[in-house]
Amino acid sequence: MTPVFLLEELQKFISSKTSDIILPVRTRTGSNEEKERAAAVYKMGLPEADDVQQKVPYILLKFLTGTDDKKAGEPEEDSCKVRIIFAVYSEDGQDGPLALLNLILRVRSELKKAGTIGGGQFALELPLEYI
C-alpha cells in the first residue's frame, strides 16, 4: 500500500461523502468571502501556516504510522494509521460541537459502509477510533 495513494483516495472519498454538509465559515470583517460551504479536505497539512483558522471548516488527513507485514510466499500486506482532523466554526456554543459531531459521524458511517476505497485497493481495519 502506498500511503500517498491512500491519502489521495481518502481525500476524494471524504470530499464526495461530505459535500452536502454546508457549514458556517469564519469571515473577516468587510470581506466578500462566502459565509457557508462544505468542509475542504486537505492531505498532511494546510496550504499556509496561518490557515488553521482561515480555512475552517476543513478536514485534514495525516499519515501517522505504517507497517509492512509481508511473510515469505504471501502477498504483500501493508497497513497504516491515518488521523482525520476535523475543524468547524460557529458563533453558537451548541451548534459548533453538533456540526463537528455530525461531520465526524458522517465520515465514520460512510467509511464503515464502504469497507474499502480506491476501487477495493484499500481496506478499512476495524475498530475505528474517534475522540
Where in the sequence are the language-model features?
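Oligomerization/assembly interface segments of phage tail-like spikes and tubes
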Residues: E76-D92, L105-V107
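A generic structural signal for short coil/turn motifs at secondary-structure boundaries
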Residues: K70-K71, E91-P97
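Generic internal hydrophobic packing segments that stabilize the cores of diverse globular domains
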Residues: Y58, K81, L100-I104
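Small/polar-rich, solvent-exposed N-terminal microdomains that initiate assembly or binding
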Residues: M1-E74
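Generic secondary-structure microfeatures
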Residues: K62-T67, I84-S90, L111
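Acidic-leaning, charged glycine-interspersed low-complexity segments
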Residues: D20, L98-I131
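Ordered, soluble secondary-structure elements with a strong preference for glycine-centered loop motifs
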Residues: V4, Q94-L101
